[in-house]
Amino acid sequence: MGISPDYGDTPLSGDELDALLPTVAELLGATKDKSALYDFEQAIHVNVAQKLMDDAINGRLAVESIVTERFIRDLHRELYGEIWTWAGAFRRHEINLGVAPEQILTETASGLDTLLYRWRNTADWNSRPFGIGVHAEILRIHPFADGNGRTSCLMADLVFLSTQDTDSLYLYEWRIDKPRYISLLREYDRHRNPRFLAEFIPIRSLVD
C-alpha cells in the first residue's frame, strides 16, 4: 500500500488546489483537506494494485514490461489521472529532492535499464533486492511532482511478484520505521546498492 502520511486535517495548498481536476474539487466540496483526498487516492490505488498484481502473478505482466520509463509514467497516470492534472507527467521544476528536471527522462531510463541488466546477467541478486532497487532508484530520481512514494512502492511489489520463483508469494511490508528508512534511502543515493534497504524492509505473505 505504500507508506501512509499523517495528514490530519491539513488543508490543501493553493498550488494543490490549482492542480486538482475540477470534478474532484467539486466532489470534495468545502472540506478540501489532505486527509479526505488521501482516502480518495487510496481507494484508486487499491483497485489499480489489485489488477496489476493479479497480472504479475499470472504472467500477464512480465518484469521486462514493468521496469521501464514508459511503465512508470503509465502507472502514475493510472494512480492519479482521476484526480490531478499532473498525473503521468515528469516534473518540470527544481525541488530539494531528486535530479534536475532536464535529467529525469535519461536518469529514469538508464537507472531502470541498469537494474534490469543486473537482474538478467548477475547471480548475486534475488527478487527481494531487485524490487527494492527499483523503489529506491525511483525515489532517488523523484520524477514526479507528487506521488513518488506510492508509485515506487507499487512498482517494487510488482517487480517482486513477477520475479519470485516459489510456491508461496510475498509482498514488501511498508509499515516500517520511517527515520531508519529515510536514512537508508540516503545511503542508497550515495552507493546505489539496495542490499541494506532490502534487508531492512520486511516481507509478508501475499495471503496475509
Task: Identify the role of each PLM range.
Residues 1-208:
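FIC/Doc superfamily catalytic core
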